[in-house]
Amino acid sequence: MGRLFGTDGVRGVANLELTAELAYKLGQAGAYVLTSETKHTPKILVGMDTRISGDMLEASLVAGLCSVGAEVACLGIAPTPTVAYLTRYYNADAGVVISASHNPYEFNGIKFFNSKGYKLSDALEERIESIILDNSEKIQLPTGEKIGRKIEIESPLDDYVNFIKSTIKGDLKGLKVAIDCANGASYQVAPVTFFELGADVCVINNEPDGVNINKDCGSTHIEQLQKFVIESGADVGLAFDGDADRVLAVDENGNMVDGDQIMAIIGLELKKQGKLTNNTIVATVMSNLGLDIMAKREGINIVKTKVGDRYVLENMLENGHVLGGEQSGHIIFLEHSTTGDGILTGAQLLNVVKSSGKKLSELASIMQVLPQVLMNARVSNQNKEKYLEDEVICEMCKELENEFRDEGRVLIRPSGTEPLVRVMIEGKDRDYIEKRALELVKVIEERLG
């Protein structure tokens, strides 16, 4: 991670870490880096989620963008993937999203997309950082008629809704869909999308007030939707996070269907249609072993990357794979999109439910989700990378792997931001793997603490 940019843009507590001043500087430096070689007046799209700090940060960001001579189209409340798509659709030079995704309302963030709708490379983010922190490049500010201005785009969300509708054949008539908008960026566009696709739509958490985004709702608190699905008699529930780049589903019985299961369902359907390029799904090292077992049975390859949707996307682009994602519900359909898109994913999943004539619970049963235990070992920061060099830790992990064979696994990795080593064990018996995880955590803390 860089000095300003983390794994998903710049993030922090609004007005404390992510200030109006920093937003202005990010707008100015970002616009300069992304548009300095264009021969025309640059056009940049800006969207945001529903946080109270969004207006403040948008005003400062837009001022920075305009100061470099860019025309800025403010989309208002819009999901992150909507901004990515519309940046491509309108042939804009860049897109910017003001959002902290699934984080509490006090936080906010700023992330950029290039003209093709992809998140920026590390090199470009480092260049923006260097301009802001080191004054490494002198930005020549225009004067007179070359100063930028805000421009209007008529009904931008309608263009996104039409895009989602174009990705499936037929409609969703006959399906009752319960949606949890997390009081976030999807609160307008998600209900409209599924209504226009023909579904009977019922919605919760679609009344944002600036401080209730993600609060006990959405994909990080799916219990509310599980209850709502049962009460409303819905066929499927969809829970988005604050910026709607991820989604988790709920079946008709109120059971959660996570990102791994969604990829299993859609991946198998794409394989049947001959559309799963290389018969491969790209997942992360944190994906459930049940996905591997299902894939092996069905003749599908699973490729694993580091945790983070940017690494999933990199692998997909390098190898031509069309489906990838994370257990958390960040799922990428490279045929249609350049980033994780919860609304697109929901539409694809519902399309399989409708076309198959099966209940979501039956479709999800193709993959058995194995119990997964996650624990943290607290160690000194300078030692957290040394677990691979410790013979005792490595030997214990090897013994556990041999014990589980193909019915469990062990994964340990350092935290990127805290003095922790994260321990994950999967297996068929939850009580047993909890016991073994505690033993491993104790050994790691003794050896590296």
UniProtKB/Swiss-Prot annotation:
Residues annotated as the enzyme's active site: S101
Annotated family: Belongs to the phosphohexose mutase family.
Reaction(s) this enzyme catalyzes, per UniProt: alpha-D-glucosamine 1-phosphate = D-glucosamine 6-phosphate
GO cellular-component term (any): cytosol
Cofactor remark from the record: Binds 1 Mg(2+) ion per subunit.
Enzyme class: isomerase
PTM characteristics: Activated by phosphorylation.
Modification Phosphoserine, positions: S101
Gene3D superfamilies found in the cross-reference section: Alpha-D-Glucose-1,6-Bisphosphate, subunit A, domain 3 (3.40.120.10), Alpha-D-phosphohexomutase, C-terminal domain (3.30.310.50)
Lineage: Bacteria, Bacillati, Bacillota, Clostridia, Eubacteriales
Cited HAMAP family: GlmM_B
InterPro entries, alphabetized: A-D-PHexomutase_a/b/a-I, A-D-PHexomutase_a/b/a-I/II/III, A-D-PHexomutase_a/b/a-II, A-D-PHexomutase_a/b/a-III, A-D-PHexomutase_C, A-D-PHexomutase_C_sf, A-D-PHexomutase_CS, Alpha-D-phosphohexomutase_SF
Molecular function GO labels: magnesium ion binding; phosphoglucosamine mutase activity; phosphomannomutase activity
NCBIfam families registered for this protein in UniProt: glmM, PRK10887.1
Binding site for Mg(2+): S101, D241, D243, D245
GO biological process, one term: UDP-N-acetylglucosamine biosynthetic process
Cofactor field: Mg(2+)
EC number, as in UniProt: 5.4.2.10
Protein name: Phosphoglucosamine mutase
Keyword Nucleotidyltransferase: no
Pfam name, any one: PGM_PMM_I
Taxonomic source organism: Acetivibrio thermocellus (strain ATCC 27405 / DSM 1237 / JCM 9322 / NBRC 103400 / NCIMB 10682 / NRRL B-4536 / VPI 7372) (Clostridium thermocellum)
Isomerase as UniProt keyword: yes
Function recorded in the entry: Catalyzes the conversion of glucosamine-6-phosphate to glucosamine-1-phosphate.
Keywords: Isomerase, Magnesium, Metal-binding, Phosphoprotein
